[in-house]
Amino acid sequence: ITYQYDGAGNLIHSSDNGGNSMDYTYDGAGNVLTQTDELGRTATYKYDQYGRLLKLTEADGSTTSYEYDVMDRIIAVTDAEGHRTSFTYDKVGNQLSMTEEDEATYQYAYDKKDRVISQTNPLGASSTFKYDGNDNVTEAADENGTVTKYAYDKNNNLVSQTDGNGNTTTYQYDELDRKIGETSPLKETNEYRYDAIGNLTKSKDPMGLITEYKYDSLSNLTEQISPKGAVTKYDYDKHGNVISVTDPKGNTNQYSVDLNDNVTKMTQANGGEYTYNYDKAGRLESMTSPLGYTKNFSYDKVDNVVKESDSLKSTTTYTYDKLHNMKSSTNALDGTTSFSYDKYGNLVKETDPLGRSNTYSYDLAGQMTSAADPLGKITAYTYDPAGNITDITKPGGRKTSYGYDKNYNVTSVTDPMGYVAKTVYDKDNRVTEETDALGQKESYTYDKDSRVTSITDKRGFTTGFDYDAHGNIQVVTDKTGLKSHLEYDKNDNLTKVTDALGGVTTYGYDNMDNLVTFTNAANKITNYTYDLEGNLTSIKDPAGRTEKFDYD
């Protein structure tokens, strides 16, 4: 990177080998007046007599304006659409409020140490905070009053977190304050080990399964070794960009990277190549697939995509408002879809190419309160103070209600007929029981890695699951106790299923992990072929009949 300065020591030009550059001009006080990039896009800055920024004008002409008090604090910001956000402060400079468009006000309160002790949203709902002597948050109560508690060691490392249901997760650290353990409320522990410079070298899950990591001298990950010994390898260029990834079966994807660290080519293990081209600003201009399909992109001065076209002659154009919200999407085949927004940036209207509109309303906290379809039928939404949906009322007054525990897991759903479905969770927030509106139950058990080990259905029948070291289902035990055995390759593709009666089904894959052969228990074979992009091109059944597929 090269730099140029003027006589006053101001940076006036910077550039790199990738073609990126930036030019600057200044006023007599050393304030930046203009900033121009390699594409000639210029942002301009205007200041008052005190050197405070009054207006920022972006390359597309959109502006943001700023107002200040006598203490040089920003008291108002007006965006490119004229929407004004104002701020107030206490005597020591803590922000007391933020008001959007003179309507939606967020308020903040502080203790004597200038720490935030409460935040109140425009609906009047507040969250509160407590601290220890080192300014660490020890309690956080949300808008519903649900409290999460935190504890720390002498080095201010988080050592425990207790959720709203009273379940505690603990954390352990080494002498260098690196996390070496995490224990769940059910006493299931993940362990971590590091090298001398802080790279993670080993992780052990609650089942005792170990994953190892190896690095080069620059701390780039070079190998990841699974609990079953499967190795994934990574190679890098001198800038630290990944240039190849080799999976456990020895299949390699290769990458080419330009001077701006953009991937310009990806060569798959099957020889298929994807190429990518970029403009001077590093924006993707075009991409070409292995079969020659090309997609092109055009941008406006502030990096919004304004046009997409492809080699199939399909073109879509986009327009935006001054805040960069999409106003319209136009396709020659489909027509134009348009979008409108309120002064807070919420989508309030969406009109399809046939002129049919969906409209939306929001409360001052930005929560959607209603949605009306093109026929004017309205669905209404209500929320609890913490923002969880409590009721959805569809046209005709059909209301569905939701109940939650203190961790905001959904515990009940009451349908419009008044029937209630219930869900029970364990201390790790895993579903252990579901009861439908008719009172029928399904239950679940888990191992220490949170994998489902059994499902008991509504008839009381239980199916059991055992897993290998990669988390693949290895044995399925049905309700009668009969077992099916499953096997996998190094990439965890299912290769063989032996059912309880000894019947064997096998699966074969190519170097892209696409299924290419399926052999059923009667030794009948089905073959599959694919193109370089992974699209299925043919299926040949055991009788020799072939079905072919083409793509546009």
Where are these regions (language model features)?
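Beta-strand elements of repeat-based all-beta scaffolds
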Residues: 1-16, 20-37, 41-58, 62-79, ...
